[in-house]
Amino acid sequence: MAKTLLPGLRLLRRLGVGSLGGGFRVLLFHDIPKEHFRFFERLLEHILAVRGVITPDQAQALLSGQVPVGCQGKIPMLLTFDDGFQSQARVAEKILDKYGVKAIFFICPGLIDIPPEGQREAIAKYIFDGKHGEDLPGNLRLLSWSEAESLLASGHTIGSHTSFHRRLTGLGPEELQGEVLGSGELLEKRLGISVHWFAYPFGNIESIDPSSYELIRSHYEFSCSGIRGLNSNQTHPLALLRDCMDPMSPLDYQEFVLLGGLDFFYRRRARRLHVMAKNADGIH
């Protein structure tokens, strides 16, 4: 793979892609097992050295056209974690806090409330879209409410990832309200915070629709997808693009993603997402 990507990497660097200021990328991570921590830390060190990491507040400033101090002349990264796996709390404690990095953790409060003995089947059914519990890694767990509180105490942000990680498209009105609005309300009640960030499950363009957007915009300021691309002040705050990252992937591939090498293949889906978000606002 490294040899295949080298020409593309050289071209992107020659064109200066990934070094122009005013935009930012949102990186998406899921479960990170303990044996992968060192690879995640290696990736984080590279990002900090070459591009920098921003906070959710700095991302908001960039969306409004401001360029925070330290972001001039480069495209920084905002780190996000989906699904609320227990491993993410360990990553925050052992690695993010060590480097002073603040991230967003999108969690499913309905799944957290399931007793431990039923969580594996719930993770398989909802997060892994129909798998069985015995098919999952043995140490896969969801974080607890106390761990969510610890993330907040360390300066991280908690966002909603719906109540049970159900695909929003195809749900009836009551089910949709429970997933989108009920999740935010439960997070606010249990954690004593205001929830401004949302990430819809599965992240692809087929997993979001206009009726979902109507509810999202009624409660949240920002909504993240899983569609790759660069965000800027032209990006609708409810149509934020994210690049899924695997800490175990080759370094050349990671750099290719960070430089936007895959954006071209997602541009139409990104456009559809943006139009849907604008239509929810009544902007045509």
Predicted regions located by residue number:
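Alpha-helical segments flanking ligand/cofactor-binding loops in enzyme cores
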Residues: 94, 149, 213-214
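A short, Lys/Arg-enriched amphipathic alpha-helix followed by its capping loop at the start of a domain
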Residues: 42-50, 95-99, 154
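Short active-site segment of divalent metal-dependent hydrolases/proteases
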Residues: 85-86, 164
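Metal-dependent polysaccharide deacetylase catalytic core of the NodB/CE4 family, i.e.
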Residues: 27, 74-77, 97-206, 237-240
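C-terminal active-site subregion of NodB/CE4 polysaccharide deacetylases
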Residues: 1-80, 86-90, 170-284
